[in-house]
Amino acid sequence: MMLIFQIALLVLVLYSLLLVVAVPVLFSSASDWSRAKNVILVGSLLWVLMVIGVGVLSFFK
């Protein structure tokens, strides 16, 4: 169970770093705002689910 927690935490950290770069780039590109808005929304929701998942795994480790 500890290995699953560590892998999930690593994925969360890497995904967070990806969002730190991707969100400002998507905000600055005004060419297709509706598509960028959907990508940011889905990415944020996925991040929240990952945080909750890591929290649950942390509880059971």
Swiss-Prot record:
Per the record, membrane topology reads: Multi-pass membrane protein
Compartment(s) where it occurs, according to its Swiss-Prot or TrEMBL record: Cellular thylakoid membrane
Identify the PANTHER family for this entry.
Answer: PHOTOSYSTEM II REACTION CENTER PROTEIN Z
Protein's UniProt keywords contain Manganese: no
Asked if the keyword Membrane belongs to this entry, the reply reads yes
Q: What is the purpose of this protein? A: May control the interaction of photosystem II (PSII) cores with the light-harvesting antenna, regulates electron flow through the 2 photosystem reaction centers. PSII is a light-driven water plastoquinone oxidoreductase, using light energy to abstract electrons from H(2)O, generating a proton gradient subsequently used for ATP formation.
Major subcellular location class = membrane
One GO cellular component, as annotated = plasma membrane-derived thylakoid membrane
GO BP term, pick one: photosystem II stabilization
Q: Which residues cross the membrane?
A: 8-28, 41-61
Q: What's the protein name?
A: Photosystem II reaction center protein Z
Q: Pfam families recorded for this chain?
A: Ycf9 (PF01737)
Q: Which UniProt keywords apply?
A: Membrane, Photosynthesis, Photosystem II, Reaction center, Thylakoid, Transmembrane, Transmembrane helix
Q: Which family does it belong to?
A: Belongs to the PsbZ family.
Q: Which NCBIfam families match?
A: PS_II_psbZ
Q: How does it assemble?
A: PSII is composed of 1 copy each of membrane proteins PsbA, PsbB, PsbC, PsbD, PsbE, PsbF, PsbH, PsbI, PsbJ, PsbK, PsbL, PsbM, PsbT, PsbX, PsbY, PsbZ, Psb30/Ycf12, peripheral proteins PsbO, CyanoQ (PsbQ), PsbU, PsbV and a large number of cofactors. It forms dimeric complexes.
The superkingdom listed in its UniProt entry is Bacteria
